[in-house]
Regions:
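Hydrophobic h-region of N-terminal signal peptides that target proteins for export
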Residues: 8-18
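N-terminal, active-site-proximal structural segment of metallo-dependent hydrolase catalytic domains
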Residues: 17-158, 350-351, 368-406, 493-495
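Second-shell loop/turn segments in exported
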Residues: 44-54, 110-119, 149-152, 174, ...
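Metal-dependent phosphoester-hydrolase catalytic domains
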Residues: 174, 178, 228-236, 246-416, ...
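OB-fold single-stranded nucleic acid-binding module
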Residues: 272, 388-498
Length: 498
């Protein structure tokens, strides 16, 4: 009897080991640059982007990643917007050797008193791996996409996709695509099972019909490779993630776009049960959340879903890797990477070291491995997602729910004589009590300075202009920002005028 019990315990332990859950995180870090002093973007020239700025960015990325797995970090991270190394070495970087070489220094020392030309020559992802290691986020293999593009491309590439993973890497391939960062394919082995990872950063301009044909080309690049894999194994385990510069419901949200990359070409869709049929092989995990909770970025007062995770049918069967149903989420942490109004705390260059995180929230999902080896059996789904079409869900940010009195800056809270016009104050909500300024623009005189007043709601803009004459009192809550170098307050909702 004891022997049988021992055998049972051994088998149970083996199954438990196989079923260890892991997380895949997709994270656009908003332009993580190295410190070699060579950059294509104006904002990242040495006069504006210092070693202290780089340290802040590295530290803050690590702080977000450390929110997962009890501080250990996810086992798979798909990064976007890491700078291409414009001063590369003659040989590819050996990230393990770099970490070993600088094991006796901290990232603060490397970018501070111990900085030298060799450190300046390190690519951004190597600096990130070091910042991770200092925080106990260790054991990662680092894979960077090649800086390649199609012959038809007309734009140079400033950024690349990078994958961090703790799983053994079996195969790596970079896929050049039209006027966008190369799509990075990484095949890993998870408890003996193959898992394909695809890290994407498609052409920007989600709402622009003029750029959608480029995203269609990006989608075709990815779809062609997926078809190769799925022809060989229709139940292959594939996780597709990154910044697609497309909404999960691109075709529904922008009906004037006759052909969309994400929906029409790639085949991303929201019927969770449909992946069991031959006609549909991909499911977009945004459909795991209620429509009101779908958002990872903001633009003109509306939520966007540019960051996405998409899974293949194989992640619903009982062979190899399996998706944990209902585990998809948005990585927004109050007091860390989230503003008081619930939007992403963007990166800011203000001050000697900068501040903030990214203009995108990361997205994540959990997975496990299953020992059955059965592709004909599918994960039972309770309340399976089913996209039934119809009008697109509301995307306007509900600013009326914000406790303005609690979070707003006031004139009394500022030091005497201080200006609001700093990078650190951008994005903050301010209680404005001033007077309407003279001129053709609607503007307010506040704390001795003049600010434009704007709203993305055209009707509200017209009402504000009609109701407020030059010299009259003007009281409202506004989000501080800049547009074309002019400082302004954005009134996000009619309830903010009071």
């Amino acid at each position: 009897m004891r022997r049988l019990v021992a055998v049972f315990i051994f088998l149970a332990a083996g199954i438990a080991a196989l079923a260890r859950p892991f997380i895949v995180l997709a994270y656009n870090v908003e332009n993580l640059h190295d410190v070699d002093g060579v950059a294509q973007f104006e904002d990242y020239q040495p006069s504006k982007y210092s070693k202290a700025h780089a340290l802040t960015k590295l530290t803050n990325i690590a702080r977000v990643v450390a929110q997962f797995e009890g501080g250990r970090g996810p086992d798979v991270i798909l990064f976007e917007e890491i700078e291409v190394d414009f001063t590369p070495s003659k040989t590819p970087p050996d990230y393990d050797a770099i970490l070993a070489r600088y094991a006796g220094l901290t990232i603060e020392e490397m970018l501070g008193p111990k900085f030298d030309a060799a450190i300046g020559d390190l690519p951004a992802e190597a600096l990130l791996a070091k910042a991770f290691a200092d925080r106990g986020l260790t054991g990662y293999h680092v894979i960077a996409a090649d800086n390649i593009r199609t012959p038809e491309s007309t734009h140079s590439l400033e950024q690349k996709c990078v994958v961090f993973t703790r799983f053994p890497v079996k195969h790596v391939r970079s896929h050049p695509t039209l006027d966008a960062r190369a799509i990075l394919e990484v095949e890993v082995e998870v408890d003996g099972a193959p898992l394909y990872l695809f890290d994407n950063h498609w052409k920007s301009g989600a709402s622009d019909p003029a750029t959608e044909p480029i995203r269609v080309a990006n989608a075709r690049t990815l779809r062609a490779r997926l078809d190769e894999i799925l022809r060989a194994d229709p139940n292959a385990d594939i996780v597709i993630g990154g910044d697609f510069n497309s909404q999960y419901n691109q075709k529904q949200r922008y009906p004037k776009m006759k052909v969309t990359g994400i929906n029409d070409v790639l085949g991303s869709q929201g019927n969770e049960l449909a992946v069991r049929s031959p006609a549909r092989d991909l499911y977009n995990l945004w459909f795991e959340l209620p429509a009101a909770d779908r958002g990872s970025d903001t633009f003109h007062g509306e939520w966007g879903t540019l960051m996405q995770l998409i899974v293949s049918r194989g992640l619903y069967d009982f062979r190899g890797v399996q998706y944990v149903d209902g585990s998809f989420g948005v990585a927004k942490f109050p007091g860390l990477n989230m503003e008081p109004d619930g939007t992403p705390k963007r990166w800011s260059f203000d001050g000697p070291a900068g501040s903030g995180f990214s203009d995108h929230f990361p997205v994540f999902a959990k997975f496990i491995t299953v020992p059955d080896g059965r592709t004909e059996r599918y994960l039972p789904l309770h309340n399976a997602a089913a996209d039934r079409g119809g009008p697109p869900p509301e995307t306007k940010i509900d600013f009326s729910r914000i406790d303005l009195e609690k979070i707003a800056l006031t004139a009394d809270s500022l030091p005497k004589g201080a200006t609001l016009r700093t990078e650190a104050n951008k994005g903050k909500i301010v209680r404005v009590e001033g007077r309407v300024a003279r001129g053709t623009r609607l503007a307010v005189e506040f704390l001795g300075e003049t600010y434009d007043v704007w709203s993305f709601d055209a009707k509200l803009r017209a009402e504000l202009r009609a109701a407020h004459k030059a010299g009259e009192p003007f009281r409202f809550y506004g989000e501080l920002g800049q547009y074309k170098e002019r400082w302004q307050f954005v009134i996000q909702d009619a309830s903010w005028v009071k």
